[in-house]
Amino acid sequence: MNPWRLLRACLQRFSAVFKGSQSQQSFADEIESHLQLHIEDNLRLGMTPEQARREAILKLGGVEMTKQSYRERNTLPLLDDLLQDLRFALRQLRRSPAFTITAALMLSLGIGASVAIFAFVDAALLKPLPYRDPTRLAGVNEAVKLFGRAPLSYPDYLDWKRLNNVFSSMDVFTGTGFMLNTSSGAEPVEAARVSDGFFRTLGTTPVLGRDFYQGEDLPSAQSTMILNYATWKLRFAGRMDIVGQVVQLSGEPYTIVGVLPEDFHFALDGGAEFWVPFHAKGECDLRRSCHSLHGIGRLKDGVTIQAAQSEMQSIASQLERQYPGDNRGQGATIELLSELIVGDIRPILLTFLAAAGLLLAIACVNVASLLLVGSESRSREIAVRGALGASRVRIVRQFLTEGLMLVTLGCVLGLGLAGLGMRLLVSLIPKHFFEGMPFFLDLGLGWHAIVFTGVIAGMAGVLFAVTPLLRLPLTALRFGLAEGYRGSTGTVWRRFGSSLVVLELMIAVVLLVGAGLLGKSLYQLLHVNLSFNPDHLAILTVEAPPSLYPKDENLIALQRQIISRISALPGVESVGLTSVAPVSFNGNTDWIRFVGRPFNGEHNEVNLRDVSADYIKMLQAKLLRGRLFSDSVDGAKPKVVVINQKLAEMYYSGQNPIGQRFGNGSLDPNSIKEIIGVVDDINEGSLGSPIWPAVYYPIYQDEDNSFTLMVRTSQSEASILPALVSTIHSIDRGVGTRGESTMSTYIHDSPAAYIHRSCAWLVGGFAALALVLSMAGLYGVIAYSVSQRTREIGVRMALGAQRSSVYQLILREAARLTLVGIVLGLIGAVGAATLMRTLLFGTAAWDVGTLASVAVVLGGCALLASYIPARRAASVNPVEALRAE
């Protein structure tokens, strides 16, 4: 056939499908006109009207056969049948609005929750990092006794970079802070110090200006900086002539040389606005024992992460032998950069996705139960269609179309709920959390989420198509018109419906137990013993620019003036300063070596905290032995320290630590300190983290330009925060403040508390919805069972059965289903809780109290859900029941 004629025929058939009855009616009218012409010719030949019509029809070859032949030649039968199925499915949904609305709402809840959580999983775990060839990027850190992932020292970085053969490039970064002079005064800003090739290793090129030159991170190089895109827009109005401008940071001039792309985010930079070269000028930068840097490297082609780990560990061992005093016990930790960024939140997101998936499963099972109930009323319809010649394939296709239509409606509503849910969840994430999770900033329903929704829709559509057919086997096509058919399948349906209810209850138990364990874990975390009183405490960080306070004596004078002025404020009871706030992180560590003991290369790592004399008293922590610091203790006096109980137990077990001395790994004379006191184990690390050995130094003996001010007040701690800030600015407007908060809020908003609270609330919400849906499913099955057993109940009551026995009959069935669901659910819940044990704090996966509580709650709800059908069954009139049958 000519290809153009073939194309024309195909287009004609395709268009005829959508023209529908209009095209067929036009052809029928034309056939009828031809038929009338032939009839008139036959009448003129003297035939009777009947003979004339008969001969005309014979001449045309049969009118109906001609119409059918036209339809077959000018339409696509399969597509035409599909459109018929769609129209019929729409009529079915409109005919049962209550069923349609109920099923669509159930599906939308499950689909919306699953898609919303999947969007978070997609953004964090599935999408590649926004860098060139991100699978070749690795995080490079050290490994020590207390840390599996520890910062590098600058000398170690130089050696690692020089000696390795696995990275084509290797660079470092570290967070820092500056004071930026603004119209309102000095403002603390976040920044990052990076080596010269940092952005080249990532594969990022500035959109304006240039990258750092090679060697621009050397101490002798000029002070330059690259701006974050948002900083360029907000602080500098997006000026195109910004390159070359000079900005004062902490009193030092920095020349702007470039602007980063708008889509550049680095999750580990602490929200840096300014990027400056790493100039190793400070005393800490040059010490091998001072660890403050994090590394990134680009793997050479063909090098695996395992090979990189092996070589860097070998280099670390070589440096340990070369520098035994500083590098004792130091290893290497090499991992993919993606794992470094999202590894900690992976189990959380997967837990959320599993919970949402279980909720979706309950919703689908509930809708399947509704379809089973609805299939009872359609048994006669299916039997009639089978009697008229409809094949089983056509009937299956019809049910599949109806299922897909229902799922499509649920998907449309679910995508709307997913969009709302994502915006709600993102709005609940504290702003400072986005610094470590920038991939959530532009969260949306991408093509991954659309494909995920399509997969859900396809699977659910098939489930909803198959479910009614389980109720209507082939025998329904033959016997569906018979009166006895319903009774022959009622028992089978009840068994299948009961299995669905058990499945619902089992899933609900798993979610409820998970929510209960996470809720208990949150309670345990928020009530953990901090060893200090967090009530009525205000906290803020003070930034004193090094250009204004270059020497220790300048800083000491400022700190003493701050303490004096703050102490004079109304309602202030005590004031303390510390280098690191409690309940923040375990870090800022050093290695110690004990005077008078043999040294065998032990790696004794401890937390270091510089605190003022009244700091321990201000916290209301217990002094267990010895004494605290006094104001007379300063840099000119012998160095003294206070230790925590953990350090005393680890290194002075059975001894009195008071008067004992220790120093750094080399026992330099200037590093020797004497222990004057032992205090309780203050929670220095993140909420709920293990207690580490800690050493408290007098803050005047080890100065830092950034320190934390803590104030205990007799009034509302929130109300005193403005007075604290204004008092500090009245001393010197060049001194900045940030992080103003109450200690209670500080703890409440801490990462550990937020993560546990999010897990508990989100999984708890899913569990509550699962409980409601499972109870609705149980109610539906019991109610339908009662309707199917009306005649049986009527016969029982006619033979003398009491209402109480009918109650027992129905409630016994509900209790059996509930018991099986609870037992299976508890078994599954313990297994699921074991998988998420990393999210639990102070709570066992098999916590008996939680398991028992869930069993009681679910059992009570099941009793209530079954009571109404049971009461209806007990109210059956035997005469009316038998007459109805």
Where is each model-derived feature located?
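Negatively charged linear elements and acidic catalytic determinants
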Residues: 1-105, 298, 317, 321, ...
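Mid-to-C-terminal secondary-structure elements
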Residues: 9, 177, 190-214, 222-350, ...
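Alpha-helical transmembrane segments of integral membrane proteins
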Residues: 70-101, 337-342, 371-397, 401, ...
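Short, strongly hydrophobic transmembrane alpha-helices
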Residues: 97-124, 128, 362-365, 407-412, ...
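Small-residue-rich transmembrane alpha-helices
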Residues: 117-120, 368, 404-477, 517-520, ...
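Short juxtamembrane loops and helix-capping segments at transmembrane helix boundaries
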Residues: 121-137, 143, 270-283, 331-336, ...
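Membrane-proximal extracellular/periplasmic loop immediately following the first transmembrane helix
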Residues: 129-177, 290-296, 523-525, 529-591
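Interfacial "coupling" helices/loops that link adjacent transmembrane helices in transporter permeases
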Residues: 363-407, 776-818, 822, 872, ...
